[in-house]
Amino acid sequence: MDNQLHFCTVDEAVEEIRQGRMIIVTDDPGRENEADLIIAAEFATTEAINFMVTHARGLVCAPLSPERADALQLPLMTSVNRENMSTAFTVSVDAAHDITTGISAAERSLTIRTLADP
């Protein structure tokens, strides 16, 4: 297994995601100067989510198209967005079934996969 750090093209990154691999995406130092762990929802297993919360220690977010957010009736978190980068967060959600607190890696995984399931 190749554990060497390397940067790939966008097409290569998309293929990695398609194959079920988690990737690291970095942004411009002039923006937030951070990195995000990204995995396709269908591969967001308990183990993958546990890795994210253990090693990245940030928010676990699930990007949605405006159409999908509307279909799920998920409003924006705030009507006036004062966030520095104008990130369009919706209200926080958990899956409607088979969830207790929603905080465990297993329940977060279920919620992410549910959000992506049309």
Where are these regions (language model features)?
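Catalytic domains of riboflavin
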Residues: 1-118
